[in-house]
Amino acid sequence: MVEPKKPFMRKPPPKTGDKKPGDRKANRRGAARLAAVQALYQMDIGGAGIDDTFAEFESHWIGNEVEGDQYLPAEAAFFRDIVSGVVRDQTKLDPLIDEALAKGWPLARIDAIIRAVMRAGAYELEHRKDIPARVVVSEYVDVAHAFVEKDETGMVNAVLDQIARQFRADEFTK
């Protein structure tokens, strides 16, 4: 069996006080978003199935030490919800993202990792009403920063903001 390529995930922030950084729900959700984007990317470029991807990430990467790097623990149910939701709804999400992109920049032309970020963010904006839209947009811009330069994170921000205003207009009129 071929060893999977090491996904890029953030290391935990330094300890502060008695609480471990990974103990906070927000940290576990942030780690889940990052892992979900990496999993979606891996599925997109490698053709892996969802069950194999879940098994690999949950057993090998998330919350484990790999090659001297400690990966953040992630909220497994949240990770699974994002990945399975994007896979299930991709045919609805992609046209939404396409509409939000600048003319002449179809989603197929966008780098695979940015497609994964936008799909995950769009899914969460549509289906996870328990999380404020501005938080979702900000979190996925942060995830994008882990992979790409500032110009591309600006595009992620613009696209997800437009989608947020479409699904959650009431949050922007307050």
Swiss-Prot record:
Q: Cellular component GO terms, alphabetically?
A: cytosol
Gene3D superfamilies membership: NusB-like
**A Gene Ontology BP annotation from the UniProt entry:** DNA-templated transcription termination
Give a yes or no for keyword Membrane in this entry. no
Biased amino acid composition, Basic and acidic residues: 16-25
SUPFAM superfamilies from the UniProt entry: NusB-like
InterPro entries the record matches? NusB-like_sf, NusB_fam, NusB_RsmB_TIM44
Q: Where is this region: Disordered?
A: 1-28
Q: Does the keyword Transcription regulation apply?
A: yes
- Which keywords describe this protein according to UniProt? RNA-binding, Transcription, Transcription antitermination, Transcription regulation
> What GO MF annotations does this protein's record show?
RNA binding
Q: Which HAMAP family match?
A: NusB (MF_00073)
- Recorded family membership: Belongs to the NusB family.
**PANTHER family tied to this protein:** ANTITERMINATION NUSB DOMAIN-CONTAINING PROTEIN, N UTILIZATION SUBSTANCE PROTEIN B-RELATED
Query: What's the stated role of this polypeptide?
Result: Involved in transcription antitermination. Required for transcription of ribosomal RNA (rRNA) genes. Binds specifically to the boxA antiterminator sequence of the ribosomal RNA (rrn) operons.
Q: What is this protein called?
A: Transcription antitermination protein NusB
**Origin species:** Rhodopseudomonas palustris (strain BisB5)
Gene (name only): nusB
